[in-house]
């Protein structure tokens, strides 16, 4: 089971991380939010759109 953890970083900004059942972080917000509601909104947007995401293969040159 996966879960989102919402927390404040050392600068007081709100962030989220997505963790597996064993605590491994597999995704994070990548940026801090001033408002907790903005952080939670970004999780909702991700959850609504993740299944539409395209998988892109990058070939090394």
Regions from the PLM with identified roles:
Residues 55, 59-61:
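Short, charged, surface-exposed hinge/linker loops at domain edges
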Residues 45-55:
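Short arginine-rich
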